[in-house]
């Protein structure tokens, strides 16, 4: 499109010199405001309770803002109560009512305090942005209250009259809730989720609901996310993998309650085929404190084994279908002597199997599903493909997700940029084309986008779906980054060498500054000002590991939000914050501690990089877009003045 055509389109939105000039003034003013605070989280793994607490408290930042605003003018108890109210207004209001404390005095004081906190939080934003973030039904009222200068006696009376009206017409509860939610919203300008929303934890669906409500968010796909996407799009092996992952943690809620996945046929198959099998190797992990009967746990173990065997068959079929995946050495089912219970590894070494009961496996054709297994797979897959709630969440994931993202000089991706030991980028060849570094990530981005839009009868569809399995656990997958995933070996083989998953050299090299710089150059980024931000590998804080390396250029922010990893990390996750003053890492305590100390909770915050001067919007990606629009509007004004384009004042 040439420049004149573009300016004519722009003229439809700004049809006069006055309107274009007004927009330039507005944009110029906006560009010199401080940049908003970005929050980075990774590896949520369905841990909705911890995630929601972190988000609603702005990673403890709300409590800090309350201290800054009120200092010693309010008691610690009152400040804690205010913090709790902001985090969970409905619950705290109900408690206040139960204690007969929901009085006119409490309402007036609370609204006044909340307005002060909201003013502090909103101070870095334009008035228009705050209005846009406010629900329309209270937009004018809250805007008025936020901009009243209390020093004037008349204004104080005016403010008190507004409070009187709120109380008189009995909307105080709804108004307080709205203020609290506005503070929550304004505290986080943008949220980056660096992969792995799904698996392990009970309710990834609740996390997705929170993200959809937030909107100002982006997501980088983790390997646990792409296997769910594959399941949703119709991949049998990914559907089985998702179900197996959930059952392995005795987590039926995420499947049945979250997305309505039908496990009835799987339950029946487990009872019929494994009725006399104790399934010792398939005992499920218990993370909650609820009591579980031995019968329920045994049944879960049998379901776990049943779906695992189906998955192994489908996985081996996939290896055979896709020789370019270079995983033919993973055809482990064909290396089993079922009669004698012996497995031969890729080097020919024999190992006794830890479990020799395979009632659904034909030793002469171990990759073939039985009719009952086929029925189970089709039923489960249909559930994934027809779940309305899953469709809503996957549509959001497609719209806001990507393999990687560059945002304000930060390179975000979940796992790794596959590398060789010498620091060169590892190559992946497919259909005679070779990909590495940035082009490899772009290749997988293309696979995801094309698979989403393929018809069921597309001849390339099966291969596209198989790639979601490769992204889950392929040796050159940037979401995975290991030589293999040893699910089969962990169930059946004792030898730790056979079980070993070798990590890609990236994970050690990225901690060295020169290799981080090499990655920045691959993505056309300035090594002097850029950062790598990823998750995937839990940082064992308990052993002294640090989330920041490469002279402050590489951040790994998987600190164990997922309860399943908290014993390994010793903490309950990291949040990286990027505000106008600095980059900082917040180290979170476990969720039980967060709950027990209520509004007093603040994480341990370490500033990792201070900026020489305050960063303004004009210094960000948004600022570049604003500058471009200002230049375009100036060109439009020139076109109006020269007569090249006619103004339209009608």
Swiss-Prot record:
Q: What is its EC number?
A: 3.1.3.11
Q: Which GO terms describe its biological process?
A: gluconeogenesis
Recite the UniProt keywords alphabetically.
Carbohydrate metabolism, Hydrolase, Manganese
Biochemical pathway: Carbohydrate biosynthesis; gluconeogenesis
InterPro entries in the record = FBPtase_class3 (IPR009164), Metallo-depent_PP-like (IPR029052)
Supply the enzyme class, top level: hydrolase
Q: List the disulfide bonds.
A: none
UniProt cross-references to Pfam families, sorted A to Z: FBPase_2 (PF06874)
Q: Which domain of life is it from?
A: Bacteria
Its catalytic activity? beta-D-fructose 1,6-bisphosphate + H2O = beta-D-fructose 6-phosphate + phosphate
In alphabetical order, the GO MF annotations are:
fructose 1,6-bisphosphate 1-phosphatase activity
Tell me its cofactors: Mn(2+)
Membership in a protein family: Belongs to the FBPase class 3 family.
Q: Which HAMAP family match?
A: FBPase_class3 (MF_01854)
Q: What is this protein called?
A: Fructose-1,6-bisphosphatase class 3
**Primary gene name:** fbp
């Amino acid at each position: 499109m040439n420049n004149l055509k573009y300016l004519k389109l722009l003229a439809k939105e700004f049809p006069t010199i006055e309107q274009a000039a007004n927009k330039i003034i507005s944009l110029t003013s906006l560009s010199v405001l401080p940049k908003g605070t970005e929050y980075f989280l990774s590896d949520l793994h369905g841990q909705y309770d911890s995630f929601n607490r972190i988000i609603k408290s702005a990673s403890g930042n709300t409590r800090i803002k309350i201290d800054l605003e009120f200092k010693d003018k309010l008691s610690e108890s009152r400040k804690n109560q205010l913090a709790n109210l902001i985090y969970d207004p409905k619950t705290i209001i109900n408690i206040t009512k139960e204690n007969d404390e929901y009085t006119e005095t409490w309402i007036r004081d609370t609204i006044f305090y909340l307005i002060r906190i909201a003013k502090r939080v909103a101070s870095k934003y334009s008035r228009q942005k705050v209005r846009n973030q406010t629900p329309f039904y209270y937009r004018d009222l809250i805007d008025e209250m936020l901009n009243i200068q209390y020093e004037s006696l008349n204004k104080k009376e005016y403010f008190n009259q507004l409070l009187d009206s709120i109380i008189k017409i009995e909307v105080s509860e709804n108004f307080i809730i709205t203020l609290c939610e506005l503070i929550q919203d304004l505290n986080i300008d943008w949220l980056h989720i660096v992969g792995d929303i799904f698996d392990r934890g009970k309710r990834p669906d609740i996390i997705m609901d929170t993200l959809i409500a937030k909107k100002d968010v982006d997501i980088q796909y983790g390997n646990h996310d792409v296997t769910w996407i594959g399941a949703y799009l119709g991949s049998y092996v990914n559907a089985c993998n998702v179900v197996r992952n959930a059952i392995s943690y005795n987590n039926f809620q995420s499947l049945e309650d979250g997305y309505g996945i039908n496990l009835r046929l799987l339950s029946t198959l487990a009872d019929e085929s494994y009725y006399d099998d104790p399934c010792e190797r398939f005992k499920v992990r218990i993370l909650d404190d609820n009591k579980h009967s031995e019968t329920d746990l045994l049944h879960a173990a049998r379901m776990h084994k049943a779906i695992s065997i189906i998955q192994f068959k489908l996985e081996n079929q996939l290896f055979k279908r896709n020789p370019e995946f270079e995983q033919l050495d993973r055809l482990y089912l064909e290396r089993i002597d079922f009669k004698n219970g012996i497995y031969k590894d890729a080097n020919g070494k024999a190992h006794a199997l830890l479990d020799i009961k395979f009632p659904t496996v034909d030793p002469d054709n171990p990759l073939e599903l039985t009719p009952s297994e086929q029925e189970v797979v089709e039923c489960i897959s249909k559930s994934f493909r027809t779940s309305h709630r899953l469709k809503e969440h996957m549509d959001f994931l497609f719209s806001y997700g990507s393999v990687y993202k560059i945002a304000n000089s930060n390179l975000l991706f979940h796992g790794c940029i596959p590398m060789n030991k010498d620091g060169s980028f590892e190559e992946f060849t497919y259909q005679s084309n070779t990909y590495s570094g940035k082009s490899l990530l772009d290749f997988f981005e293309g696979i995801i986008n094309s698979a989403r839009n393929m018809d069921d009868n597309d001849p390339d569809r099966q291969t596209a779906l198989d790639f979601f399995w490769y992204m889950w656990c392929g040796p050159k997958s940037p979401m995975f980054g290991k030589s293999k995933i040893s699910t089969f070996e962990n169930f059946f083989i004792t030898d730790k060498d056979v079980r070993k998953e070798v990590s890609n050299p990236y994970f050690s090299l990225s901690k060295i500054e020169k290799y981080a710089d090499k990655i920045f150059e691959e993505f056309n980024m300035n090594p002097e000002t850029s950062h790598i931000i990823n998750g995937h590998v839990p940082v064992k804080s308990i052993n002294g590991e640090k989330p920041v390396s490469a002279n402050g250029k590489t951040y790994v922010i998987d600190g164990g939000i997922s309860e399943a990893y908290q014993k390994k990390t010793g903490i309950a996750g990291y949040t990286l914050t990027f505000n106008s003053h600095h980059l900082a890492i917040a180290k979170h305590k476990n969720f039980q501690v967060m709950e027990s100390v209520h509004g007093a909770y603040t994480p341990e915050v370490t500033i990792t990089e201070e900026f020489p001067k305050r960063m303004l919007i004009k210094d960000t990606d948004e600022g570049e877009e604003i500058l471009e629009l200002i230049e375009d509007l100036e060109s439009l004004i020139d076109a109006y003045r020269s007569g090249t384009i006619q103004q339209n004042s009608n």
